[in-house]
């Protein structure tokens, strides 16, 4: 049987790894315009969509033109969001609101660049938007 004394350091190590992993997603500059979550049914038919299911972004990398909008659509009961970091420790971090099942979140990318993102409560969920 595993004792609490043995388990606590392991949990602490996992937590520190997760925190460190999110710091690796530092951004030099992000210029986005966001909306609050909307019903997935309201996402335009011709939109660039990243689905979320089974604890992952289904299209982990998308390429768009500056000024275009990406919609993240949550298809599962587990709440998710989209977050970007501007600094290693999270200064000026952008974190979208949590989406529940059948909700979508839209972000407009106004400047060219490569934008790595992750889900705040699930930092192993990662993706990238490349803006040309």
From Swiss-Prot:
User: Gene name?
Assistant: mauC
Q: Which organism is it from?
A: Paracoccus versutus
Write one Gene Ontology MF term.
copper ion binding
Which of UniProt's keywords are assigned here? Copper, Electron transport, Metal-binding, Periplasm, Pyrrolidone carboxylic acid, Signal, Transport
Q: GO cellular component terms?
A: periplasmic space
Q: Which NCBIfam families match?
A: amicyanin
| Cofactor: binding comment | Binds 1 copper ion per subunit.
Chain ranges of the Plastocyanin-like domain: 27-132
Give the pathway annotation. One-carbon metabolism; methylamine degradation
Q: Which residues form the signal peptide?
A: 1-26
Its subcellular locations are: Periplasm
- Residues annotated for Cu cation binding in this entry: 80, 119, 122, 125
Report the function annotation for this chain: Primary acceptor of electrons from methylamine dehydrogenase. Passes those electrons on either a soluble cytochrome c or to pseudoazurin.
Per the record, the domain of life is Bacteria
Its protein name is Amicyanin
Q: Which residues carry this modification: Pyrrolidone carboxylic acid?
A: 27
Q: Does the keyword Nucleotidyltransferase apply?
A: no
């Amino acid at each position: 049987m595993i004792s609490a004394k043995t388990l606590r350091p392991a949990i602490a190590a996992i937590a520190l790894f997760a925190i460190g992993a999110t710091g690796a997603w530092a951004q030099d500059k992000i210029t986005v315009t966001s909306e609050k979550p909307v019903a997935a049914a309201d996402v335009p038919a011709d939109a660039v969509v990243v689905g979320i299911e089974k604890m992952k972004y289904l299209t982990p990398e998308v390429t768009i033109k500056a000024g275009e909008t990406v919609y993240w659509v949550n298809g599962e009961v587990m709440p998710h969001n989209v977050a970007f970091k501007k600094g290693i420790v999270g200064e000026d971090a952008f974190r979208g609101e949590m989406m529940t099942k059948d909700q979508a979140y839209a972000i407009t990318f106004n400047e060219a660049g490569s934008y790595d993102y992750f889900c705040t409560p699930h930092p192993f969920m990662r993706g990238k938007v490349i803006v040309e």
